[in-house]
Amino acid sequence: MDLSAVVEVEELGAKYYDNGVQGDIYDILKNYGVNSVRLRLWNDPYTEDGVPYGAGTNDLEVYKKLAKRAMDHGMSILLDYHYSDFWADPGKQRVPKAWRGMDADQLEQAVYDYTRETLLEMKAAGVLPQLVQVGNELTNGLMWPLGQKPEYDNIAKFVSAGIRAVRSVDSDIPVMIHLDNGGNNPMYVDWFDHYMERGEDFDIIGMSYYPFWHGTMKELETNMRDMADRYGKKIVIAEVSMGFTMEDYAEYEKLGPDDRKGYATKHSLVENLDYPMTPEGQADFMNDIMKLIDDVPGGDGFYYWEAGWIPVPGSGWATEGALSYIEESGPCGNEWANQALFDYDGHALPALKTIRDYKPAHDDLSLIHI
């Protein structure tokens, strides 16, 4: 489970329940079979005046808090380096403020140093991750413009620097390279063919799969099978989610209509989905995703994205300071609450029981990361 925003929403008043009983979200998820937590890391998610960017404000100290709770519950950790001060995805990959003006060689060294130094600090704090992804949704590269696709030499240079840094701290930590759009096989082949010619070896191909953006489940399966066979890598669905309602949650955010973005699952995106946006539809989707991963050779698990990001006043995908950094105009607010695994009041949804009760189709297969 990706739980990166949990500290923020808890501090703003979020509470979680299972069968009507309030509990710690980690306790609840542990009881539903969750064995691994994914946590993002931003370099410096603050304005020059120290105002948080929001969306979890996932700096190193927040990582330590969330990671400690995971380890206390016997969960492993996937660390998600963004190499940015805020969101890094196919639409934006901003260079961290402290690295602006660097050339490609300097950025390569900065990635190595930052990765190594943060991992060593995590190790000293007893929260070294068991799995690391070097970059987030690298479909169009990282640290633009020097690492923007089609600058594959620089993309490989930057990613490889991160991989070398991970290996220097602990050579046994598996490394993931993560792209979005898991149903787009030609894009994956093109990207990894270019990378394999230039970059350091790695262990896992990570995919994002959101059914309202990334094609059919059959297209995802085709891509997973091809990637596992073509490159000999394990496959993890690093981000996945499905909505449980199309009911609005404006009353929970307490924002004006011009100040909130609303949910990402617009009606035009979900009208052709194979699953209804209901608690039952969400549960059925998760059952089928787990079966798909289990059936694909090399399938190694999934991370449900932001399972606990329920709507509370003050928590959203960005603040005004963050918008300035990423050069976007907003509006802000939570756009993911109808895809959490808890309803708007924090009650566990049926999909969690589906995840817990899933039985592998083959005795020698199991979902390692969930």
Identify the role of each PLM range:
Residues M1, L29, D80, V132, ...:
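Conserved, mostly hydrophobic/aromatic
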Residues M1-I25:
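Boundary/entry segment of secreted carbohydrate-active catalytic domains
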Residues S4-V6, W42-D44, H82-S84, V134-T139, ...:
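Active-site beta-loop-alpha junctions enriched in small/polar residues
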Residues V21-A88, E151-D172, L220-R230:
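Aromatic-lined substrate-binding rim segments of carbohydrate-active enzymes
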Residues I25, D170-P174, P186-D190, H194-E271, ...:
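Glycoside hydrolase catalytic-domain groove-lining segments
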Residues Y53, N58-V62, A88-F202, G215-M224, ...:
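Active-site cleft segment of glycoside hydrolase catalytic domains centered on the general acid/base Glu
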Residues F212, V236-T245, D258-H362:
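Substrate-binding cleft of secreted/luminal carbohydrate-active enzymes
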Residues I368-I370:
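Conserved small/polar residues in nucleotide/adenosyl-binding loops
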